Amino acid sequence: MPSLLIGTSGWAYANWKGPFYPEDCPRRRYLEYYAQEFPTTEVNSSFYHLPRAATYEQWTAQVPPEFVFALKVSRLITHHKRLVDVEEPWRAFVDRARVLGRHLGPLLLQFPPSFRCDRPRLARFLASACRPAASDPPLRLVCEFRHESWFTGDVYDLLQRHGAALCIADSPRYPRRDVRTAEFVYVRFHGRTQMFASSYTDEELTKEARWLKRAAQDGHDLYVYFNNDARGHAVENAWTLRRLMEGRRRKKTQRAGGV
């Protein structure tokens, strides 16, 4: 049965105290509390620096066995080197990521909007990155392109050949293409009218739920993350979409204020 994992991009937001976290919840327990509400999160800090192994170990100690961390790949790989001569930093990133063990989810490669399509370069990277050591479980890779030139049939075919997913990213700033290229679907909701700041309406989320249900019926695992973290919109929208997808009520929890 396909997995349905809906969560938010990150959890350590100070302005979520009150709207989401109880007022008496210390910051060190945010993840533990978050993991009672959601089955997954997308880690953004890994984009800026390589987390320590001890950090990953601390995280896994705070979440249930089935909890999943999706990791945003280092900007050294996607922005600075732009997939050129990245064998060493890629291996370092992946080796560290595997400390998460069963909790490791997809790895998101978010490319800058100034990075135009270079299919041969992407092909060389995927050929190497999607070939793990025999003893390692396969990785789920996701590509979020932000330049229009990447959205072509040739690029989709390349992703499909390597089992990598095209990130379906909803935002007011960058192109969106609802194209499935892998056995799983990866969606990022950045905010429809304001990047990172606007909330989705119930009507908008109902429409999104329809096509996501079709993807699930086709056997695709679903990873869905809300990146509109301002004022707690992400948690509200994540719960609404989950309710629409699963036909369930939100579970009752003790908290100061409601989301």
Describe the residue ranges of each PLM region.
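Residues lining hydrophobic/aromatic ligand-binding pockets adjacent to catalytic sites
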Residues: 1-259
